[in-house]
């Protein structure tokens, strides 16, 4: 069963306008609606991470997420905080969120004791840049991508496990779009080889492709028109081993998953009936 992460950005400069919720009341309303229409988890981003994003201090990140965490205090297990800043992460841990999502993949060992004492799940993301936000200068070649991603995760998972973090708390995100390369071919190669990654790593995978640059480069459309391409990529990811999908359109994805699962049941039933006919 796939877990759907709905994207909620508490920023002024996220690359997809419709994901932005700047006022606390609007953010709470949007989060509740996401949970209603199909999100299992709301992934809350207090700072953008695309190449043109402006820096946000930990104090401002905390100021942005605090009202939402107050409002969702009885559903903290369904909240993820998307931040790579240790101060924000420690605050989120103290509030009892269900997930921490780090685009740098938790590089700071000083945070590990706090993580080990908590029980939230960790989305450990790979990026070619290794630190900071996505850039247009990193360039991971398609033919090198899988080996590089596996090497990164083997080292990072080992470090987290040695610090006392249980393996069943770890979720791995290979990174997509500018986090891999400005060239769409790298993301397409990784997306088409999810099964290989999952077999090599042996841990759950999260895939986040929603409205990303490589989709636009592939189909020749702007961000605002990438809903159908995003859904197609997300369904491909689910069919090829993704356990978690992070999306701007959780309601659409949930409907598509429901239909796909229903169709699979009918296909299985029909195959079983044909077997009985030939018995």
Swiss-Prot record:
Copy the pathway line from the protein's UniProt record.
Answer: Cofactor biosynthesis; tetrahydrofolate biosynthesis; 7,8-dihydrofolate from 2-amino-4-hydroxy-6-hydroxymethyl-7,8-dihydropteridine diphosphate and 4-aminobenzoate: step 1/2
Q: What class of enzyme is it?
A: transferase
| Residues engaged in binding 4-aminobenzoate | 49, 178, 213
What Gene3D superfamilies does UniProt report for this protein, alphabetically? Dihydropteroate synthase-like
Keyword Lyase listed: no
Which cofactors does it use?
Answer: Mg(2+)
Swiss-Prot/TrEMBL keywords: Antibiotic resistance, Folate biosynthesis, Magnesium, Metal-binding, Plasmid, Transferase, Transposable element
* Similarity annotation: Belongs to the DHPS family.
Protein's recorded name: Dihydropteroate synthase type-1
- Biological classification of the source: Bacteria, Pseudomonadati, Pseudomonadota, Gammaproteobacteria, Enterobacterales
Protein encoded by which gene: sul1
């Amino acid at each position: 069963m796939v877990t759907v992460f709905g994207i909620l950005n508490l920023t002024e400069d996220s690359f997809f306008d419709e994901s932005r919720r700047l006022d606390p009341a609007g953010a709470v309303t949007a989060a509740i609606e996401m949970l209603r229409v199909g999100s299992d988890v709301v992934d809350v981003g207090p700072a953008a991470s695309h190449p043109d994003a402006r820096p946000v201090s930990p104090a401002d990140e905390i100021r942005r997420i605090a009202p939402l965490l107050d409002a969702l205090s009885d559903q903290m297990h369904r909240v993820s905080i998307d931040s790579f800043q240790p101060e924000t992460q420690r605050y989120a841990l103290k509030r009892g969120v269900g997930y921490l999502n780090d685009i740098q993949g938790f590089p700071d060992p000083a945070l590990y004791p706090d993580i080990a004492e908590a029980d939230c799940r960790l989305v450990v993301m790979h990026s070619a840049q290794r630190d900071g936000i996505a850039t247009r200068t990193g360039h991971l070649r398609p033919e090198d991508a899988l080996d590089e991603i596996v090497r990164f995760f083997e080292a990072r998972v080992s470090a987290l496990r040695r610090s006392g973090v249980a393996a069943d708390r770890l979720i791995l995100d290979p990174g997509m779009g500018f986090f891999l390369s400005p060239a769409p071919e790298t993301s397409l190669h990784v997306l088409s080889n999810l099964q290989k990654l999952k077999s090599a790593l042996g841990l759950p995978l999260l895939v986040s492709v929603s409205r990303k640059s490589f989709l636009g480069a592939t189909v020749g459309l702007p961000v605002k028109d990438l809903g159908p391409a995003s859904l197609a990529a997300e369904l491909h990811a689910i069919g090829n081993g993704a356990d978690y999908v992070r999306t701007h359109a959780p309601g659409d994805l949930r409907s598509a998953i429901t239909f796909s699962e229903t169709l699979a049941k009918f296909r299985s039933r029909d195959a079983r009936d044909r077997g009985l006919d030939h018995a």
